[in-house]
């Protein structure tokens, strides 16, 4: 299970969003399961912390950064952009 998925002409992006400022491995379980079914998808974990991290192919992004990048993330999923 993931919170939401974007699909467009450049592929799939899957997102898990948590309010917490701390990350534990079990929080990434849904993204890892989704990635098994869709290995080419880009995975994002958005959380309430302050550090940008990476866990394997999962990009871990602070909420503030994700909000600033939202126009880019959304335009990526629009067909023809």
PLM-predicted stretches and their roles:
Residues 1-81:
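A cross-kingdom feature that marks ATP-driven nucleic-acid transaction machinery
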């Amino acid at each position: 299970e993931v919170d939401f998925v974007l699909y467009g002409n450049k592929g799939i992006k899957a997102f898990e969003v948590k309010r917490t400022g701390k990350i534990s491995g079990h929080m990434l379980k849904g993204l890892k399961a989704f990635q098994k079914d869709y290995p080419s998808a880009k995975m994002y974990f958005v959380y309430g912390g302050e550090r940008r991290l990476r866990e394997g192919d999962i990009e871990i992004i602070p909420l503030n950064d994700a909000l600033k990048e939202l126009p880019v993330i959304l335009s990526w999923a629009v067909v023809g952009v």
